[in-house]
Structure formats: C-alpha cells, structure tokens
C-alpha cells in the first residue's frame, strides 16, 4: 500500500456527462505533484451517481495515466453486500490496485454484521481492501476491535481510511494491530496529528486543489520534520475546513472551478455551492496564495 497522499479525486461533469478531458488533466497534475494514489469513484468522486460503464472507463483511464507512478484505488462500497461485490469485481477487472469499501450506510449493521460483510467480500476478492469508516455519513461506526479482528482474519484487508472525528479511534486501531495495519487519515485537518501517531498518510480532499502542499505536509510528517509539517498544517488548516462548509464534494468542486480546472457541476441530489460559499472559498484561497 502507499505512504503519503492519496487524492480522493473529483469526477468532473460537463452538461451532465463525465468530462474525461478535464479529469485526465486533473489526475496528471496530481501525479506530477507527487501524489501516491488516486481514489476513483469515492465520496468525493460522486461514485454513487456513476454508472458501471462510467466507473470502468474512469478506472481504466486512471490506470493508463498513473503508469505505475501511483496506485489506483476504487471506491466500491454500498449498503448491499452483493452489489458491493459486483462493483468490486468490476473494478478489479478494470485495473484497480486496491478497493476502498465504505461501511454499509443507512441499514446500520451491528459489529457482527460489519465483520460478516467485510469477511464475505475478502473471501471473494483478490485485491487489497481498505475499510472506510466515516460515521458522519453512514450512521455507523466500525469499532477498533472489529477492525483488528478483520485485520487478523482476512489477509487482504490491509488498511483503513479512518474519518471518525474521534482521533482516539485511530490510536486504538494502531494499538490493537501492533502498528502492522495501514491507517490513513480520512480528514485533511487531522492528517498531521494522525501521521504523528502512526498513520501512513492521508486520503485527501484538499489535495485536489493543493496537491504539492499536501504531499509536503505528509512527507515532512513521515520524516519526523514536525516543525515544518506543523507550519504547513496551520497555514492551510482554514482552507481544509472551508472545503467542508457544505457537503463534500460541493466546495472542492467550486474551488476547482475558481482555479479554472473544471466546470462547477454535480449530479443530483447534490447541487453547486451557494454564492456565500464560493465567496468564502475565494477569500481563503487568496489568503493562502492558491488563487491570485
């Protein structure tokens, strides 16, 4: 698995269709900036609104662009175990290096249900699996004990993207797995702290617009250059937070539009950012030198 930054890449749209040209330019910028993984069709990529054909084309295109320079990780999680398996097998066939599988949402499984879900998938998939824990969006939290049990019982469950706002959860996973399990921060504003505590990196939203800066933040922290990393963290902390003043990926798409990289389009039920959000983004981006 990668260490450093994996970008949870947006999916650009133009007139309702995937804008593959803008997508390719965005991915190439990420690779040139030192990003070590591209996460396709995740939350930030509006994966739940993509067709299977769009997913497969995006994965194949990303694989072609990365050319071994970065891993291609595909978001395949749903709240239906069989549907998740179908999307995961499709992603494997299309060239995925690993699978990011969010905990089932809405139906709120128990810890035993979460264990059974991931174990079922691990027994039928060949690529490494990254558990994705984001209770604020799913309504369920996978416990450190369940994560450790899966890490012990399923050889291809190798990592977790931990987006629980309680950093003690990541600490407990690290302790229970003896530091042998890859932990990635799922929150940009917690990346510095979590890497200091043993995480291998961050799966980042902010790196869509500040890839070089997020790469430097992660690398300096991994190299134990805490002073430099802390300075980067605080310089961009306000921007990291502003990217979540509305539901992700609404603000980051508005920010990319301000940079002239993509159109400010989303698929329903998401809609473009409010004007007040755009103005706030513009103000903060100018403040930190991202926008002139």
Swiss-Prot record:
Pathway: Amino-acid biosynthesis; L-lysine biosynthesis via DAP pathway; (S)-tetrahydrodipicolinate from L-aspartate: step 3/4. Pyruvate binds at residues 44, 203. The keyword Cytoplasm applies. One of its GO terms (molecular function) is 4-hydroxy-tetrahydrodipicolinate synthase activity. It is found in: Cytoplasm. The active site is at residues 132, 161. Keywords: Amino-acid biosynthesis, Cytoplasm, Diaminopimelate biosynthesis, Lyase, Lysine biosynthesis, Schiff base. Gene3D superfamilies: Aldolase class I. GO terms for cellular component: cytosol. GO terms for biological process: diaminopimelate biosynthetic process; lysine biosynthetic process via diaminopimelate. The record marks 43, 106 as: Part of a proton relay during catalysis. Its EC number is 4.3.3.7. It comes from the Bacteria. NCBIfam families: dapA (TIGR00674). Catalyzes the condensation of (S)-aspartate-beta-semialdehyde [(S)-ASA] and pyruvate to 4-hydroxy-tetrahydrodipicolinate (HTPA). This is 4-hydroxy-tetrahydrodipicolinate synthase. It comes from Fervidobacterium nodosum (strain ATCC 35602 / DSM 5306 / Rt17-B1). The gene is dapA.
